[in-house]
């Protein structure tokens, strides 16, 4: 009821154990709600993060399995996030499923797609997923990075550190187009990434001659698997 009375409703997200906080606009009578601010908790208080991608990708993950970089958009801002996965044999009975910063039901759906469409047997394995930095991301375009990180951990094979990706996964294993692909690619290019996996449909209308980053279009999960792991 209170939300209908006031002009603006802001939601402050974060956890006391993480340094980053997100300020979202849920209702704004005088402007857009498609905006958000990212802040870092320091000893002297909250400070705005002007370039969240650089902070969220500050850790060196070269040669590490279970890590994939996604180009996400929250509000109107593109930024890159590190998706981490750990897959191990279930030695304590029922397999465990845990997701931090990502919807657990959606992760279970992606695991079912991997098992049904790609043939990876994950039903008897523990799967843990984490979005680095404590951020909660709702962008479906990080689906491709989620399954890539899971496959990387399951095979114990690292993804090249200069690879970034964006794509939504459908139930038949297709990689569906995502919105604002130019902004996602531009953010990855700005931070020095060399290859970008994207849905094949999104390649239409992009002037690849002006880009310094290699675009790798994929239609199915199987194609993304071959592009990443050979």
Language-model features, listed with the residues they occupy:
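Peripheral, non-AAA+ core regions of ATP-driven protein-machinery
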Residues: 1-230
